[in-house]
Amino acid sequence: MTTQLLAQHGWGGDQRSWAPWRPLAEQRGWRLSCAERGYGQLPPQQPGWDPHASRRVVIGHSLGPHLLPAELWQQATTAVFLASFAAFVPPGREGRPVAAALRAMAARLAAGDASGLLRDFHTQVAAPFPPERLPPGPLEQGISEAGAQRLGADLALLCLL
């Protein structure tokens, strides 16, 4: 039985966050494929399923599962969600602070502050630990112009969830 893992990072990350998983997968004879949004200097890529894989496992972090195409999901046999969600902005009054924070983040992106926004975001999500404890991401290599646009588009997707 052949197993393929297909991993998708979340908002503001990149595929390098899955590097520690690779040797563990290989030890088990599993193939690990990593999707990449291309926020930084790594080009976007969307791997597909190996036609010989009998087990097709999606591993998605945070927004990651929402970034994968429907046809990929239709062929998956298992899903693993890491700190993910079905909905991001709660309905009604409870969702107002979250929606306001997302609008403020979008304004920073529109003003050209993608790197500063990601630094602040990483500080928040890493807390109470320092952001240096997070896996490497696009900040280390620099945010590309196209990457900043993708960050904005994916941030807008969060508003719809």
Language model segments and positions:
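Gly/Ala-rich beta-loop-alpha elbow adjacent to hydrolase catalytic centers
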Residues: 59-68
